[in-house]
Every structure is written in structure tokens, then in C-alpha cells.
Amino acid sequence: MTLRKRSAQTKMWESPVVSQGKPSLLELPLKESLPKDSGLKAVPSTHTLYVGHLNPQFSVPVLACLLRDTLERLELPVAREQIEVVRRPRNTYALVQVAAPKAVLASLPWRLQMALEEQLILKELTARGKELVLSEGLESLHHREQDDSGPSPSHSPGPSPGPSPGPSPGFRRPPLPQLADPPPNWGSAGRRQISQNRPSGVRSDSAIVHQKILGQEQLFQGAFLGSETRNMEFKRGGGEYLSLAFKHHVRRYVCAFLNSEGGSLLVGVEDSGLVQGIHCSHRDEDRTRLLVDSILQGFKPQVFPDAYTLTFIPVISTTMTSVPLKVLRLTVHTPKAQGEPQLYETDQGEVFLRRDGSIQGPLSVGAIQDWCRQKWTAELSKLEEKVDVLTLEKEQLQEQLRQRQTLSCSCCVL
């Protein structure tokens, strides 16, 4: 009975999804095989993704929520139910069920490297002193568990370590595919391909304000708000987002917007710009307001209430729900010009900056010094321009004064 169960589990990981009552592709006769140009390779199949070296300080729900947000950043959206987080004494990892073509999975390491360089991955997601590990299949889990935590977990669907009685495909998984080297221009071409997946048309934060979305009584589910910009960030939310991952995003994005030109964080909107909404009751609104206020009160220098606005916009949907759908909008107004450059830090002493479509931080001491040097250099250039303008005006006034004095000294004798 154990042998049959293990065989069924093993076949589930290595074969594509098959409807009940229908033969699998391996059982089809050779003459009925699909042609080479039928596009079968492009059809997404179910795979298991291993994500290792997660931060054990977070609970399982928090890690699942943060991991889902990270995979969405890597253009690999998954549902919360498809993420299984396992906490071990020496390694906390997750098993994620994804439906994607092989080419997408093959490019994941390079997408991850690019996202790490652009500060798109939350630093707190990874265990201290380690790097985030992404690999396909359960073989990597088996080897890593032997290296990090001793014997493999009991719930692993892999075969027993004993010798295999034969080359039966029910007990042998195919080896992990070798990841091909990225193309030379993947850095720019990859980002261009990701951006092409979004709807055309970009609207800035000011354009959305001009359309009176702030004063509008409702939004319609499925409406298009444009694409993410330097001062506009979308989050899908949903599930336990408000109670788990939202506070981390408040720290990162509010601090980054304060240190740049302001901006807005919209929760309940997909990365593509389509409105979906999140389930948010009046009690959730009160808790969210208290959470935002408590976090921003710890910022340095102090952030006053008039520096930000928290709005809950109702979402009209065709389906009836017991809890209303809303879009949460946290807007950070453009910081007022100060006599000297100010750099805001969170209640945890971290500093973030807003880049085009990404967040940089937490900044190191050297990066903060470079930021201050650039800000002071920019302020010095502005002051030098003002001095040049005032000097030119002074010379013009002195020239006009000399001309008037020359005219007043001349006299006519009759």
C-alpha cells in the first residue's frame, strides 16, 4: 500500500496535469502523437518550485504572503494556497506549485539576480547571512535537507533511498534541466519583455488625481488605472495582506516617497493596473489607520499628519460579497522644500529611496553619504545660479545709475 501511494505521488510531480478518466500522454500510441509544430512545449505545465533560506523569524503566514509578493515581482503569480512553507531548525523553505512553461522557469535565476540588483526583493525575506535559493523540482530539496537538516522530511514525495528494483518511470524522476546561459542582452531585453506584458498607456500620479479618483465615490472592478510609475505603486493585496505584509510595505514605500518626490501606494490593484479590490470592513479600516499612524510616528525626522493621506475607495463588483471590496490608497505628498536636505528613516532605522519602478534600500552608510553629497552638490549649484543672476542684476543697476548721474551733471548755458 505504501509502494502504491508513493508511486502515485511521484507520478504527480513528473507528468503534466491529466483530467480524470483520460489517458496520459505517455499512454497514447505513437501514431497519435502530436506534431512537432503543434506548440505543445509552450503549454504551461505544473511544476514544484523550491525556495530556500527563508527568514525563520517570520511566521508561516507572513512568509507565504511575502513570498507570493516576491514571485509576482518575478512575473510568476501564484495563489496563496499554492505555497507551502516548512520551518526546519536549520532551514526554512517553501514548496510552490506553479503552472509555467519550462522557458520561464529556466530564466528564474537570472530574473532573481536582476531583481536583487534592482532592490525588488524584500531583504527581510531571506535568512541573515544567506542568499535566497530558487530551484525547480524536489531533488534539490532532498539534497539540501540532507546537508542542512539531516534526513529528508517524512512528507517528501520522493522515493526511498534504497536501491530501485528497476528503471520503472513511476519511481524515477527526470534529472533537473540544465539552465541555459542568459543571452548577452537579457538585462535590457528581459525588462522590455516584462514591460510589454502590461497594458499600453502610462498615467502619472497627477493624471489619476486630475481624473478625480480621490473624490470619486467608487471604482469599478476591472477598471484600468494605467501602469506603475516612479510615483505610483500597485499591490494586489488580498488574503492576510493587511495584517501581515502591509506594514513592511508602508515602511519601504512611504520612506522612499518621502526621500523623493512623493507618490502613492494602491492596494487592491494588480501590477497590470486593473482594479480588483480587497475585502476590507470598517474594523479593518480602523486597524489599518492605527497601524499606519503608529509606524509613521516612529519616522525620523517626524512625519506630520498633513504629509500623507489614507483613503479607502469602494469597488463596485458584479458578484455579491459579504465583506465590501475597497482599494486602499496611501498617498505621500511632495515634501516641502527645506533649508537643508532631509533624509527620512523608518522606525527601524532603515533608509529607502525610490527609483524608477523599484525601491533601493535599506541603504548602507556609504550610500547615505553619497546621497547627502549629491543633495548638497545640487543645492550648491542652485545657490551659484542665484548668485550669478543677482550679480548680473547688480551690474545692470550700477550701469543704469552711472547713466543717470552723467545726464544730471550736464548743463546748458544760454
Swiss-Prot record:
Record's keyword terms, sorted: ATP-binding, Coiled coil, Nucleotide-binding
Highest taxon of the lineage: Eukaryota
Pfam families: SLFN_AlbA_2
Coiled coil: 373-407
Residue spans of biased composition, Pro residues class: 154-185
Chain intervals for the UniProt region annotation (Disordered): 141-203
Gene3D superfamilies: Schlafen, AAA domain (3.30.950.30)
InterPro entries for this protein: Schlafen (IPR029684), Schlafen_AlbA_2_dom (IPR007421), Schlafen_AlbA_2_dom_sf (IPR038461)
Binding-site residues for ATP, renumbered to this chain: 268-275
Disulphide bond pairs: none
UniProt GO MF annotations: ATP binding
Family label: Belongs to the Schlafen family. Subgroup I subfamily.
Protein name: Schlafen-like protein 1
Biological source species: Rattus norvegicus (Rat)
